[in-house]
Amino acid sequence: MLAKRIIPCLDIKDGQTVKGTNFVNLRQAGDPVELGRAYSEQGADELVFLDITASHEGRKTFTELVKRIAANINIPFTVGGGINELSDVDRLLNAGADKISINSSAIRNPQLIDDIAKNFGSQVCVLAVDAKQTENGWKCYLNGGRIETDKELLAWTKEAQERGAGEILFTSMNHDGVKTGYANEALASLADQLSIPVIASGGAGLKEHFRDAFLVGKADAALAASVFHFGEIKIPELKSYLCGEGITIRG
């Protein structure tokens, strides 16, 4: 089994880390530079920075903030939000990002996936998908979960893989911030049908939820925000628990 990854996520709004429930009711969760440094020191495997209102508000990700966070961590760093063209990717990689996460822009212009993969390599391109389970299956949403699209989760992630995405970051909007566990059934079907890594997001509340994401959901990595930001779960303790459950963990 490849080592599983634990990934804290900084959801950024107006330069501050925030956390909501089901994509709304945001509350402040701390200084992103300090949080990033702390997670890096505590043994997080990667860090994700999502400027959650950039696509909605139509502005560019905070390049300066990305630079400051990158200077304070020594783990792989993924940045997303408001990335619409190759010049955005170039700017953020130069600011210290290792990978770029695209979401709304890829749904509107799928060719962007091909272009990033061709120009920077598949390993740089993370397709983030915000999906909600409806009566008609899992539907993908745009602009931070504000607009439903006709794209279905499995079909869209398969297309992204074919276009050159190197990783899928799947957030279940039904589970986001609710802390009742990840969408393991959907995760497992993604893992079974894709050959690229899948990151689970949305729903972590207990250490057991991470275990289930790996063992039941077959995820390659598990991302969480509030349980880390508010000190409910500490990364070293989580890793030692997962090792005890027979899961291969980095570090």
Swiss-Prot record:
GO terms for biological process: L-histidine biosynthetic process. The keyword Lipid metabolism does not apply. Keywords: Amino-acid biosynthesis, Cytoplasm, Histidine biosynthesis, Lyase. InterPro entries: Aldolase_TIM, His_biosynth, HisF, IGPS_HisA/HisF, RibuloseP-bd_barrel. Its EC number is 4.3.2.10. It is an enzyme of class 4 (lyase). The active site is at residues 11, 130. One of its GO terms (cellular component) is cytoplasm. It catalyses: 5-[(5-phospho-1-deoxy-D-ribulos-1-ylimino)methylamino]-1-(5-phospho-beta-D-ribosyl)imidazole-4-carboxamide + L-glutamine = D-erythro-1-(imidazol-4-yl)glycerol 3-phosphate + 5-amino-1-(5-phospho-beta-D-ribosyl)imidazole-4-carboxamide + L-glutamate + H(+). It is found in: Cytoplasm. Pathway: Amino-acid biosynthesis; L-histidine biosynthesis; L-histidine from 5-phospho-alpha-D-ribose 1-diphosphate: step 5/9. Pfam families: His_biosynth. SUPFAM superfamilies: Ribulose-phoshate binding barrel. GO terms for molecular function: imidazoleglycerol-phosphate synthase activity; lyase activity. The keyword Amino-acid biosynthesis applies. IGPS catalyzes the conversion of PRFAR and glutamine to IGP, AICAR and glutamate. The HisF subunit catalyzes the cyclization activity that produces IGP and AICAR from PRFAR using the ammonia provided by the HisH subunit. PANTHER family: IMIDAZOLE GLYCEROL PHOSPHATE SYNTHASE HISHF, IMIDAZOLE GLYCEROL PHOSPHATE SYNTHASE SUBUNIT HISF/H IGP SYNTHASE SUBUNIT HISF/H. Belongs to the HisA/HisF family. Heterodimer of HisH and HisF. This is Imidazole glycerol phosphate synthase subunit HisF.
